[in-house]
Design a protein with these regions (language model features):
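Regulatory helix-to-disordered linker/tail regions at the edges of structured cores
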Residues: 43, 100-135
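N-terminal amphipathic alpha-helical segments
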Residues: 1-70, 74, 89, 96, ...
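Elongated alpha-helical scaffolds
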Residues: 77-91
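A generic alpha-helix preference that emphasizes hydrophobic side chains
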Residues: 5, 79, 116-117
Length: 135
């Protein structure tokens, strides 16, 4: 289990990572509706992560030691899961960006993009639930 400071650092790192992904994905928005949806979902994830970061910083010291330990443990798992999803999407985005036939590559990667979108939705829901628990 990590401490509060390490978790704050992990959240900040994930926010920076998502912002970078968002920039790369924005270059691909016009290739397909899946790429456009990916940009939208990454933007929402970025907002959710910023909200979680703010709520976590404001309220983590207000809860009991037991509640704090549970919150740290569960939120760490959520952040790691979200990071794994983003890493997989980064790989897909990079394959499309490096392709000479971006539109064709985007179509070939459509299934992976859709799967990533489903995972992002699940990750965001989990983070929102966690945020509701924190407050």
């Amino acid at each position: 289990m990590v401490g509060a400071l390490e978790l704050v650092t992990s959240i900040a790192g994930l926010i920076a990572f998502v912002e970078t992904l968002l920039g790369f994905a924005s270059e691909l928005r016009s290739l397909s509706s899946d790429c456009s949806s990916l940009v939208d979902e990454l933007a929402v994830l970025n907002r959710v992560l910023n909200e979680v970061d703010r709520e976590f910083r404001e309220s983590i010291n207000l809860c009991t030691a037991e509640a704090r330990a549970t919150t740290l443990d569960v939120l760490e798992g959520c952040i790691l899961q979200c990071k794994a999803t983003c890493e997989e999407l980064r790989d897909v985005i990079n394959r499309i960006r490096r392709s000479k036939a971006k539109k064709v590559r985007a179509r070939l990667e459509a299934g992976k993009i859709r799967e990533g979108l489903k995972r992002l939705e699940r990750d965001k829901s989990t983070l929102r639930l966690m945020m509701a628990t924190i407050t």
